[in-house]
């Protein structure tokens, strides 16, 4: 029986209490110039009062980024679309409020004994990984992890790449213990698609990034799930086998203070937990490899292609980093 998971789907850049911690910073003219350049890049406009607040938050973030990058780490941070946001705002807009019970995700995956290829990247095998999407300010990462895995599964089985409807999962999957923008689990979403007899395409059920009434039309379903492979909790080697031999794998992990501004490199953290009750963001492992003796996962995120490494990140493999092996699964498509 798995513990209760309290999931979020956006990440958390810990600024301390930003409203007070960042409000008294002495800002240089260079920092102001850099902020204005960032505003242009990200098409940001503020009132005069809000400008001063955003400037303080931005400078606080930027200084933390520079301090991190000056240290000896396996990954770098960088400015991105979240750089003018405080932790409280991120928590309000992105973090899930509904706890998720992983007891429904009991392991049924039987792994072999290997050996497995030293590296794998489904993106390089053909058109088997759909483009990076953007969940916006809705805790719907679980829907993007779900559709990404099923899009890959269908493409691997048929050679046809689909774009599936995350909004259908947001609106319609509540009976499988999912809660729209407040949270959910890919394993439960796969079960919903399986018993619901399909999921529609993005073109017929477009993404809104907010909770709405279910508008599923069975005759317009274009992808179906035959079964769900749920990997035994904390069996990271089974995740390697699944990604190597079968399909990209959906998983959840705990985002902590230094992840939101990730730019490149192999992410690792000493502040996150390895327990299933702390994971808070769902993503998709599309491959794995090793660099300078450090094994890593190649992971597709849902924060748009401008975030991280063109929408992807690397995270250390083999240590259950941030609980990433706690809740892993992938769909077996009905084709």
UniProtKB/Swiss-Prot annotation:
This is Pro-cathepsin H. Keywords: Disulfide bond, Glycoprotein, Hydrolase, Lysosome, Protease, Signal, Thiol protease, Zymogen. Composed of cathepsin H and mini chain; disulfide-linked. Cathepsin H may be split into heavy and light chain. All chains are held together by disulfide bonds. GO terms for biological process: bradykinin catabolic process; cellular response to thyroid hormone stimulus; dichotomous subdivision of terminal units involved in lung branching; ERK1 and ERK2 cascade; immune response; immune response-regulating signaling pathway; lysosomal protein catabolic process; membrane protein proteolysis. Disulfide bonds join 102-327, 138-181, 172-214, 272-322. It catalyses: Hydrolysis of proteins, acting as an aminopeptidase (notably, cleaving Arg-|-Xaa bonds) as well as an endopeptidase. It comes from the Eukaryota. Residues 23-97, 107-115 form a propeptide. Glycans are attached at residues 72, 101, 230. It comes from Sus scrofa (Pig). Belongs to the peptidase C1 family. Its EC number is 3.4.22.16. GO terms for cellular component: alveolar lamellar body; cytoplasmic ribonucleoprotein granule; cytosol; extracellular space; lysosome. It is an enzyme of class 3 (hydrolase). SMART domains: Inhibitor_I29 (SM00848), Pept_C1 (SM00645). Residues 1-22 form the signal peptide. It is found in: Lysosome. Its main location: other. GO terms for molecular function: aminopeptidase activity; cysteine-type endopeptidase activator activity involved in apoptotic process; cysteine-type endopeptidase activity; cysteine-type peptidase activity; endopeptidase activity; HLA-A specific activating MHC class I receptor activity; serine-type endopeptidase activity; thyroid hormone binding. It holds the Pfam family Inhibitor_I29. The active site is at residues 141, 281, 301.
